């Protein structure tokens, strides 16, 4: 069974600082055409940083699209499509929390919204942490703190953590440690 679509035309209709929006015409498997709107994004990283006492570094920050403060794992965007995700993860952990790590484990890639964006989020676990100084971007305001991993698993079960990348990062890291 053929399920693939083929791009026939493509035009950029918005070119922003973080995203580009394009409108494509696609040939469908049944021979008809359809319009596809695609948000292009460089991608991002998410870090489940665990202390020696199995606490997770967590951040609180205001998320403008939702109009509220959310709790998340440290995360950020790739500066370019070809940036090494591990290097971006190290940078984001350092910027947002001040911490660096000696041990990094790749936990996988997450496609947050497969229907209309090509964004990928690379998820890492960081261990053997060393505390340093936060270096937030000038337009970034957040607070970081430590939370026991067991309580985060309960928070996910009870719908207290709505962010998908954070849920996935916590659950993948917890699985490695038998939680």
Task: Show the residue positions of the predicted features.
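Acidic, metal-coordinating catalytic segment for phosphate/diphosphate chemistry
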Residues: 11-46, 51-52
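Unchanged
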Residues: 34, 43-46, 77-164
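Short glycine/serine/proline-enriched coil/turn segments at secondary-structure junctions
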Residues: 16, 65, 113-116
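Charged phosphate-binding loop/patch that engages nucleotide di/tri-phosphates or the phosphate backbone
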Residues: 166-179
């Amino acid at each position: 069974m053929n399920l693939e679509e083929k791009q026939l035309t493509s035009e950029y209709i918005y070119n922003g600082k973080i995203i580009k929006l394009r409108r494509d015409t696609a040939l469908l498997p049944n021979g008809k055409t359809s319009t596809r709107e695609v948000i292009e994004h460089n991608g991002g990283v998410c870090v489940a940083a665990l202390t020696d006492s199995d606490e997770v570094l967590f951040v609180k920050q205001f998320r403008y699209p939702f109009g509220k403060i959310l709790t998340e794992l440290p995360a950020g965007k790739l500066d370019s499509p070809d940036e090494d995700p591990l290097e971006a993860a190290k940078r984001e952990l350092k910027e947002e929390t001040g911490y660096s790590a000696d041990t990094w484990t790749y936990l996988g890639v997450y496609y947050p919204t497969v229907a209309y964006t090509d964004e990928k989020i690379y998820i890492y676990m960081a261990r053997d942490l060393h505390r340093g100084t936060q270096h937030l971007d000038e337009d970034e305001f957040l607070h970081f703190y430590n939370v026991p991993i067991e309580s985060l698993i309960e928070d996910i079960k009870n719908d207290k953590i709505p962010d998908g990348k954070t849920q996935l990062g916590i659950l993948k890291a917890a699985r490695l440690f038998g939680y």
